[in-house]
Amino acid sequence: MTRVKRGYVARKRRKKVLSLTKGFRGSSSVLFRSANQRNMKALKYAYRDRRKMKREFRKLWITRINAATRMSNMTYSTFIHKLKKANIVLNRKLLAQLAVRDQQVFQQLFSYIEGV
C-alpha cells in the first residue's frame, strides 16, 4: 500500500476550520485543535439557541399582549379565550405588534370582543 501524505487535503480542511473561527478570542482562532473544538461548540450553541429563540419570542409576545390587555382591565387568558370564542384567528406575534405599534386597532379589537 502506498503512503499518502495528505498535504493539500489536510491543509484545506484546517484552513476551512480556521476561517470559520475567525474573530474568536485568543488562540481559538489561531491554533487548529482549539479552533476545531471552539467551532464544534459554537455550532452546538447555534443549534440550541435557534430553538431557544422561538420560546423566548413567544414569551415576549405574551408579555406584551398581557400588558396591553391589563390596561383595559382584562387578563391575557380571558382575552385569548374571547378571541377564540369570537372566531378571530390572529397569532400572538401579530397581536403583540398591534398592542405595541397600533393601539387604536387593538382597542377596536378589544371592544369587538367585549360585544360578543
Curated annotation (Swiss-Prot):
Residue runs in coiled coils: none
The cysteines joined by S-S bonds are none
Spell out the subcellular localization from the entry: Plastid, Chloroplast
> What is the protein named?
Large ribosomal subunit protein bL20c
What keywords would UniProt list here?
Chloroplast, Plastid, Ribonucleoprotein, Ribosomal protein, RNA-binding, rRNA-binding
Q: What is its main location?
A: plastid
- Cite a GO CC annotation: ribosome
- GO MF terms on file? rRNA binding; structural constituent of ribosome
Which SUPFAM superfamilies does the record match to this protein? Ribosomal protein L20
Which terms does the UniProt entry file under GO BP? Answer: ribosomal large subunit assembly; translation
